[in-house]
Structure formats: C-alpha cells, structure tokens
C-alpha cells in the first residue's frame, strides 16, 4: 500500500493516484554573499554637490523630485558623514573597515558611476545663490531619506498618523545640528506627489547603506536614521516576531522551539536558521539584506514562516498585546490549529513567573541561602518510589515545561479549554479589530463559544 496514494471509483473504473499540489510557490533566496564583493549599484555621473543640492531642494519645494537625481545626490553626499570605525568590521567574509579607520557610508558598499549626466533642473525656481553648508546638506539628506520611511507606512494606519510622523521628522531636521531648509508640511506634500520611494531599488539601496552606517558609527548627524531605520530587518517580520517572542517569555530560542508541537513548524524552523547566515551577527549585511538587494524573496518574512508567525501572535493575543491583536493573520498557515496551541502556551507563560532570590545583605546570608537551596534539592531528589512524580506533575496542571504542556493538550483532545476561549474572547472583544487581524479572527471564531 502506497501511503501517498488514494483509491476511488470513477465511471465504474477504480482509479489510484497521488494527489500532489505545489506546497510552496516561492523560491526563497538567502542573502549570503558568495563572491566576497561588497553590495553594488550603478548611478549616473557624479554631480557638483553645490549644484545638486540647489536642484534637489528646488525640486522638493515644488514637490517634483527626479529619483535618479536624488539617488545621485545622496551617493555623492556620503562624503560629508565621515566617522571612525570602533572595531574591525567584517560581514560574510568581507572586511568593511579596520578599527580606527576613517569611513563614510560609501565604505560599506560599491557605487559605480557611468557617464550619464543628471537632469539637475531648478523646478521650484532659483532661491539660493550661496553655496550650502554641511548642516544644510545633512538636513536635505535626512529629509530625502525620510521619504523611504513615509512610503513604508501602510494604509492600515488611519487618521493623521503619517502626517504626524512627517511633522515630527521635519522638526528633527530643523533643530541643531541640522538647520531649517524647507517650510512646514513640505515633506508630506513631496511624499504625496510620489508615494512609492521604497520600491525604487537604488533609493532603497542608499537608504539601507546610510542606516547600516549610522547604526554603528557615532556621528553628529546620526539622527538621519529616523528616516532609514525601517530598512533594518526589512521583510523579516517572521524572524523579528520570533526574537521578540523569546524575550517576552524569557527563554532561549532552543527552549522556546521545544514548545512548537506541530509538523508544519519543521520546514519553517529549518528555513529560519539556515546555516551560514549571519542572523545573530551585529552590524552584518544580513540586517539590511533586502534594501541592499542581496535577496529577492525573503526567507524570514511572515509569509515564509507563517505557522511560527501565527503561533507567536496568538500567544501575544492571549497576553493582551496590542501589536499581536493588530497583526495580520497568515490565513494559509493553519490559524485554527495555531490558535489552539497559542492558548495553551499563553496559559503557560501568562501570569506566572520563575522567581528566586538573587541579592543579599552580605556574603554570609548568600552562603546560608545557597546551603538551604541545596538541601531542598536533595530532599526533592530522594524519591521513595511510591509515586511516579512525573505523571503527578503532568496531571496536576501546575507543572511547567514542554512535556507538561503537551500532556495537557493531549488530555483535552487537542482542543481549547473553556478558560482559554474566555480569555481569547475577552482580549479581542475589547479591541477595535482591524480587517484580517488576529483580533478579528478570534472574535469571529470563538465569540459564539464563550
């Protein structure tokens, strides 16, 4: 008997076939750099920086920016942001800089130039006759890069959220060490005229480069990161959610994964922790691999690890976390099953902690405490054999650990308990549910059962 086949009758004929579907329609690409060459882009001919500044500022005031000119200017302006490398900096085998080296954002990547002249029009008229200062260049760079952040804010954020962010960014870039170079609301007006900056590959590359530089190098103008910070771990919401989850429940990654009782986690965990990736290396190219063009389809997105993502946010919902209630359910990744496991794990980690004394008045008190704890442990280990203490723990409902939780799930036939459902309904019904969010899913799925 072939376990993969099914047998049925069609038009009086017995048919045997293997039902096969495409399980994963995407080919995920890992961001490892195989050729030991820094990430690279090609731009037009390097401009005269003073002329470029006046042209781009004029375009911003007129809400008519030329993306090619903007990218050419941002690359040329990197020379203004020199800093000192604090340690030897390597990533994927590439030496970026030695400790003590003077570096600019340009040191992290390779920017090639061709002979194509920029446009450099003065679309907003000629207002500035003198040459700009470094502070003015820094302010313009900061405002331009902030268009990336604004274009990444999704339509789910209602009201004046985006306008408020734009206003706060403008305030940053008119306060020392920056200087005011545009009128109020210019940034939002410019964004509205071209809202898709985050989809322009060269602009995205430059935003990621600036962010990678300022995240490591202490600099007078480090606040430029306010517009680029969204390039860090971009399209890695699955991995980022997992990292936040283990911090939230105070376990290591290894300890947390022991609670993932479902076969669909296997491929996702393997994908998330692919050997050779610098997922745990500070200041690696990995952190900005999407913006630097090192991967087409991220293996770390919420869709790539949808079961892990769903489970983590169901646990978050159980704990009443707004971020989880607002997150979007990955509908194709067993949300009903993940909500069951999420209920049990939520119960396991919510409202209970592991506590012990760690601080003492003096060394004598510390030694007395340690001696008393050793005695307690010895007594606990002296099992007289009359009770199978493991089984007793499983069925008492008080034991902690993967085995105890798994036993509780099995005892209840893989179904949620009434207390779990009440908790889910309580947290989701008190929340303004967004479409397709975890809050909406829990409300629709369990409100009639409570």
Curated annotation (Swiss-Prot):
SUPFAM superfamilies: Rhabdovirus nucleoprotein-like. Keywords: Capsid protein, Helical capsid protein, Host cytoplasm, Phosphoprotein, Ribonucleoprotein, RNA-binding, Superantigen, Viral nucleoprotein, Virion. It is found in: Virion; Host cytoplasm. InterPro entries: Rhabdo_ncapsid, Rhabdovirus_ncapsid_C, Rhabdovirus_ncapsid_N, Rhabdovirus_nucleoprotein-like. One of its GO terms (cellular component) is host cell cytoplasm. Phosphorylated by host CK2. Unphosphorylated protein N seems to have a better affinity for leader viral promoter encapsidation. Phosphorylation of protein N in ribonucleocapsid may stabilize the interaction with protein P, thereby playing an important role in viral transcription/replication. Changing residue 10 to A: In strain: RC-HL. It holds the Pfam family Rhabdo_ncap. GO terms for molecular function: RNA binding. Encapsidates the genome in a ratio of one protein N per nine ribonucleotides, protecting it from nucleases. If expressed without protein P it binds non-specifically RNA and therefore can bind it's own mRNA. Interaction with protein P abolishes any non-specific RNA binding, and prevents phosphorylation. The soluble N-P complex encapsidates specifically the genomic RNA, with protein N protecting the genome like a pearl necklace. The encapsidated genomic RNA is termed the nucleocapsid (NC) and serves as template for viral transcription and replication. Displays a superantigen activity in human and mouse, activating mostly V-beta-8 subtypes of T-cell receptor. Belongs to the lyssavirus nucleocapsid protein family. Homomultimerizes to form the nucleocapsid. Binds to viral genomic RNA. In nucleocapsid, binds protein P and thereby positions the polymerase on the template. Protein P acts as a chaperone on free protein N to prevent it from aggregation before encapsidating genomic RNA. This is Nucleoprotein. The gene is N.
């Amino acid at each position: 008997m072939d376990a993969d086949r099914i047998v049925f009758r069609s038009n009086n004929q017995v048919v045997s076939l293997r039902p096969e579907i495409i399980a994963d329609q995407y080919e995920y690409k890992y961001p490892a750099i195989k050729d030991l060459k820094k990430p690279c882009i090609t731009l037009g001919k390097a401009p005269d920086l003073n002329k470029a500044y006046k042209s781009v500022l004029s375009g911003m005031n007129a809400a008519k920016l030329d993306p090619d000119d903007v990218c050419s200017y941002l690359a040329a302006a990197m020379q203004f942001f020199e800093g000192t490398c604090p340690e030897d900096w390597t990533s994927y085998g590439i030496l970026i800089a030695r400790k003590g080296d003077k570096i600019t954002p340009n040191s992290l990547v390779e920017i090639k130039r061709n002979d194509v002249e920029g446009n450099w029009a003065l679309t907003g008229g000629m207002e500035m006759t003198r040459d700009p200062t470094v502070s003015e260049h820094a302010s313009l760079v900061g405002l331009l890069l902030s268009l990336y952040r604004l274009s990444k804010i999704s339509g789910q954020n209602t009201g004046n959220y985006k306008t408020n962010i734009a206003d706060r960014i403008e305030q940053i870039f008119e306060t020392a060490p920056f200087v005011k170079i545009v009128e109020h609301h210019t940034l939002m007006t410019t964004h509205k005229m071209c809202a898709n900056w985050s989809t322009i590959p060269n602009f995205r590359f430059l935003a990621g480069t600036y962010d990678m530089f300022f995240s490591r190098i202490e600099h007078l103008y480090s606040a430029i990161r306010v517009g680029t910070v969204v390039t860090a771990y971009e399209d890695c919401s699955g991995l980022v959610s997992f990292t936040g989850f283990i911090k939230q429940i105070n376990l290591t990654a290894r300890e947390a994964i022991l609670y993932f009782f479902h076969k669909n986690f296997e491929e996702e965990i393997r994908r998330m922790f692919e050997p050779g990736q610098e997922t745990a290396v500070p200041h690696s190219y990995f952190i900005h691999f999407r913006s630097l063009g090192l991967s087409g389809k991220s293996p770390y997105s919420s869709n790539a690890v949808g079961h892990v993502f769903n489970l983590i946010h169901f646990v978050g919902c159980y704990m009443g976390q707004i971020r989880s209630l607002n997150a979007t359910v990955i509908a194709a990744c067993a949300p009903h099953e993940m909500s069951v496991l999420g209920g049990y794990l939520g119960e396991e980690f919510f409202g209970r902690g592991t506590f012990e004394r760690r601080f003492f008045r003096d060394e004598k008190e510390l030694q007395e405490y340690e001696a008393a704890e050793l005695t307690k442990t010895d007594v606990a280990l002296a099992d007289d054999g009359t009770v199978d203490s493991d089984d007793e723990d499983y069925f008492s409902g008080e034991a902690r650990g993967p085995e105890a939780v798994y036993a509780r799930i099995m005892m209840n036939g893989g179904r949620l308990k009434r207390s779990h459902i009440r908790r889910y309904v309580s947290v989701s019904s008190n929340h303004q549910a967004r479409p397709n969010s975890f809050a909406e899913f829990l409300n629709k799925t369990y409100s009639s059962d409570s």
